Amino acid sequence: HDQRLEPVDLQLLGTSASKQQRPGRDQAAQADRSDRPAGEQQHQDPDALLAQFPGAQGERLVQFAGSTADSVFDLINKHAMDVPHTRNGWIQGAHTAAGVAQVQHRAAQWAKHGVTGARALSGSETAALLGTDKYLGGWLDPRGGGIQPLSYARGLARAAMNAGASIYGQSPATALHRDGSSWRVETAQGASVRAERVVLCTNGYTGALWPGLARSVITPNSFQVATEPLPEAVANTLLPQGHVSSDTRQLLLYFRLDHQRRLIMGGRGPFREPSSPTDWAHLERVLGRMFPAAASAPIAYRWCGRVAITRDFLPHLHEPQPGLLINIGCMGRGIGLQTAMGRAMANYLLSGKADALPVPVTAVAKFPLHRFRQIYLSAIIAWYRMNDGGLA
């Protein structure tokens, strides 16, 4: 039985999901566990997951949610990947009093579920660990960390090829259909791949490969900027213990220092595709206000990519026909989430046992008012930005 993997729908490996304003060096970086969309955070607390999925399913999901960072760092170490990374913990900063109560509750929940070192932080502790005084408190999750995701994508590809997989670049999939007892995937180059089973993981770039799938998610842009490498004296004052961070805003901010001492900051931007550097101006203003010591640092890179958000802010699995498994909805957390989900899906495809999956397999369902998404999302983003603390 041939178990070879034939991934298609790739452009240059690891780069097709990000549009860089400045071409050149491979500088796409974000913090693992940091890019979380508006409204999603409360749905990831263990108590909320257990309430939504009682019994063994909920316990499985909580365990899965808590293991995603382990999946990433374990693979990096197992395959000796050349991936710049740190694992000193993730801090969620609270920008309001309500946010302080939220993160205190969240820290207590994860501590109750066995996360050693999960704890709430005072305002002064948060300021000392992040290098900014813009938060009233926070919580520390020691499981989190940061990686260079392009290096990670290439490391995964190399490990897969070493295990016998074939990877085809510059071969976007254009059609998917049944061909007797198997599936045929057509590509833009005219070539096709036949397979007994297909896993469809197009997420924020889902097109028309499967009916209704693109209408099951909304896909806002996540924008990021990176400074030129900071002087060591400045960099040492920002996230001095190597944490990565995001916050409790509806339009959250996430930030970290990379291995070259670049300060990287991300957040929401226009729903439309960017047209000029001014589309990143709000992030640059925020960066300067949060970290005055870095305010004069030139911005070296600006880029963005689409994230897929589901109705319930959880990843969705669909199996509309035998041999076709669909995974969609990373909510901006694809590095850890999809690393762990890939292993779970592989176990399911090999065993046929549904309890190998962290979430139940469901039918594809349309997102409400999907055709008007750009209108209402733009209005929601503007409202959130006005009420999120005024940093931008």
Where are these regions (language model features)?
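C-terminal catalytic lobe of FAD-dependent flavoproteins
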Residues: 269, 273-392
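Active-site substrate-recognition segment that forms the wall
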Residues: 70-71, 76-86, 173-175, 182, ...
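Dinucleotide-binding Rossmann-like beta1-alpha1 core, especially the glycine-rich loop
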Residues: 42-124
